[in-house]
């Protein structure tokens, strides 16, 4: 009997040790092999080293400061940001234009956007997909982004400079919670992807969604409303 109790106790201790949270490592790589995420207990300003890179958890304010580099000199590259706590990414790309370089812009593909609800104007008038400003190898691949919480994508790619070069297959995005797609892809005049699989049942505004996209011949989203 005592032996059985000892076995049970040892088993319990073993399970407890296995389930103990590792508070020495605040960040981890998502199962997709790309996205860098923060653990549930992480707060703004938490830092940690993962695969040789020092990361910092940021929030809406830190990610959208126009004088970002002067306020946060410890963060020298975009790839050092862990964005799990960010909920609003409206027009942030414009703030990064002052950096004068897109050498590390590709690293935004590692950003965790799973809690973001607004991407309104995210890349509005951004040079970030234009090979005249960005080396082809530094253009970010946005197909890994988990946009399932986003409700506002209005103007997300509106008149991005070099918009002719934005033609990524974003058909796998979960846009089922988006209500506003006003001018989302307006001006991306080389975009040509099949977005007919998108669940746009909640969209209430898609006006001018695809204006000035002359090359777009593949199926577009099946909106439940008119997108004049």
Where are the regions that the model predicts?
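N-terminal hydrophobic targeting signals that begin at the initiator methionine
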Residues: 1-2, 18
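Sec-dependent signal peptide recognition
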Residues: 2-8
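C-terminal motif of bacterial Sec signal peptides marking the signal peptidase cleavage site
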Residues: 13-16
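Negatively charged
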Residues: 18-228
């Amino acid at each position: 009997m005592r032996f059985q109790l000892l076995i049970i106790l040892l088993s319990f201790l073993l399970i407890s040790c296995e389930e103990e949270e590792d508070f020495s490592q605040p960040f981890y790589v998502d199962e997709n092999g790309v996205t860098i995420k923060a653990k549930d207990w992480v707060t703004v300003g938490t830092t940690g080293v993962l695969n040789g890179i020092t990361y910092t958890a940021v929030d809406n304010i830190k990610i959208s400061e126009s004088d970002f580099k002067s306020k946060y000199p410890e963060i020298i590259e975009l790839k050092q940001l862990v964005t799990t706590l960010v909920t609003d990414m409206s027009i942030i790309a414009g703030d990064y234009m002052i950096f004068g370089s897109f050498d590390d812009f590709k690293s935004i593909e590692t950003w965790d956007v799973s809690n973001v609800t607004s991407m309104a104007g995210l890349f509005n008038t951004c040079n970030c997909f234009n090979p005249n400003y960005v080396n082809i190898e530094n253009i970010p691949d946005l197909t890994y982004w988990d946009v399932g919480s986003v409700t506002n994508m209005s103007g997300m790619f509106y008149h991005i400079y070099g918009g002719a070069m934005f033609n990524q297959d974003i058909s796998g995005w979960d846009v089922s919670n988006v209500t506003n797609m006003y001018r989302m892809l307006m001006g991306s005049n080389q975009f040509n992807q099949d977005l007919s699989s998108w669940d746009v049942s909640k969209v209430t505004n898609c006006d001018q969604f695809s204006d000035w996209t002359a090359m777009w011949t593949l199926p577009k989203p099946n909106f439940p409303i008119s997108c004049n």
